[in-house]
Amino acid sequence: MAKEVAGKLRLQIRGGAANPSPPVGPALGSKGVNIMEFCKQFNAKTQDRIGKLLPVVVTYYVDKSFDFVIKNPPVAVQLLEIVKLKSGSAEPNRKKIAEITWEQVKAIAEYKMADLNCFSVEKAIQMVIGTAKSMGIHVKRDFSEKQLNS
């Protein structure tokens, strides 16, 4: 028999850096989840991704137990890593702060495909381009129609 789900909680935590202080502690503690056990398990599972911002979906049950799923870093974080900046443009429509190539966009889309709510790489690429535009990052489009479909 399956456990009865009490709820789900979404957090963004740096890999290997979960601790009981805010925002993790209060968010989990108010739901009755064992904070120290979560921190130990999360830090153990994210040893290979230390320092990266990781979205986590915590499912907590009526019996105070929990499960969690670690997703890939957000597209915005990956874009900022590629262009080596700390934040996007304050005026993305007027001021472009960086430029990325089509190959980099495609690589991010393929990497994030499992976490995005789309079924084709082309749609995932459009989502990545939209995120880049909203951050003031220009996508260099030096490709033919043949490359678009490959």
Curated annotation (Swiss-Prot):
The UniProt entry's GO biological process terms, in alphabetical order, are: translation
Entry keywords, A to Z = Methylation, Ribonucleoprotein, Ribosomal protein, RNA-binding, rRNA-binding
Q: Which Gene3D superfamilies match?
A: Ribosomal protein L11, C-terminal domain, Ribosomal protein L11/L12, N-terminal domain
Superkingdom:
Bacteria
Provide one Gene Ontology cellular component.
Answer: cytosolic large ribosomal subunit
Q: How is it modified after translation?
A: One or more lysine residues are methylated.
Asked if the record carries the keyword Glycosyltransferase, the reply is: no
What NCBIfam families does its record include?
Answer: L11_bact
The free-text function statement in the UniProt record for this protein reads: Forms part of the ribosomal stalk which helps the ribosome interact with GTP-bound translation factors.
- This chain's protein is named Large ribosomal subunit protein uL11
- Lineage of the native species? Bacteria, Pseudomonadati, Bacteroidota, Bacteroidia, Bacteroidales
